[in-house]
Amino acid sequence: FEPINEHIKAGKPVFGTCAGMILLAQRLENDPNVYFGALDATVRRNAYGRQLGSFMATENVATFHADGTPAGVIENFPLVFIRGPFVAETGANARVMCEANGNTVALQQGRILATAFHPEITPDTRIHEFFLII
């Protein structure tokens, strides 16, 4: 974990998906551990249940400049959830990028992105393209 922790502390871009969101969170609702603690949020592990609770959705994803000001919207982005977490509480330093079924499922804090869904298993690369420019 140390090379990743050094990368985060250096202010370099980081993108955590699913378990990556858990690792980046400052607080976990149902886990006493804190891993990197870089994202001002409380995350609930396995919030969507077991493998059979996996699902897909399509939502708009807001994007932000590193200073937190709005950058734009990625419209109609496919979301694939596999036993994913969700954000139980967003801290003042993080920005909500996306909600699905009434739950926050993507956050941005400066150059840190975290999603409860798996953008890497869809052919849509727009969120990765955004990550490359923050």
Task: Place the predicted regions along the sequence by residue.
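Cysteine-nucleophile active-site neighborhood
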Residues: 1-62
